[in-house]
Amino acid sequence: IVSSQYQEKDHQCNTYMKLLDEDNDYIWNLDCDEIFKSRDIETIMEVLEEFKITSVGFRSRSFYGGFDNVLGGFEEGAEFMRIRKVYPGSYWATHRPPTIAHTIPIHERLPERHLDHNTLDEKLGVRMYHYSYVFPQQVKQKVSYYKAAVSKQNCIDDYFENVYLPWVTGSQSTRSRIEEEYDGVHEFKPSVRGSCRTKPFEEEHPEIILQNMDKLKKKFEDQLNEFRTH
């Protein structure tokens, strides 16, 4: 599903790269459902400055079917590349995986130094809060896009109807049955991704989510009711 004036994400991302100021040091690329805690943003900024990091990857707390459960397994173990050092003329070589290329000579750049997701999580306790499988409309659109244009044969057929919606609306026994059948609930086939089961979220949401939780939960219920009536 591709809409608007952009052919794909590479085209879209390189359009905004042209608008960066020459003195910009980093690009922190996020989707609209990716949130960070304020204190974690400050920590990252301090680390970038002190250690001259050129790229940062994050572990994700990926929420599923609401705000109380997250995905474990392969999703929790994956590294989400989100911060890259940029220079005048830098551009996206590709968005999958997120890769920035540079036009200035290599001797004018910082030595490559990556802060990986495991170190960031284990040493500094920083993760990305990813509300990627929360709202029914969001999930249906996301999976349709991946099935049509990105992952294609790697996606479970009729995922929204057979996995997500029955899991969200089902009893605990229904949820357990679904997770047993698919070794989790991620839209990729188990043979591709490995195990990816849900587990309770036992931490605190970022501030902006807490401030808007009532509205977000209402949005979730309103969307869910739309599918219940279909």
Set out the residue ranges of the language-model regions.
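Active-site-proximal specificity loops/subdomain of glycosyltransferases
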Residues: 1-25
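Catalytic-site signature of metal-activated, phosphate-bearing donor transferases
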Residues: 7-14, 35-230
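Short beta-strand-to-loop acidic/aromatic patch adjacent to the donor-nucleotide binding site
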Residues: 23-37
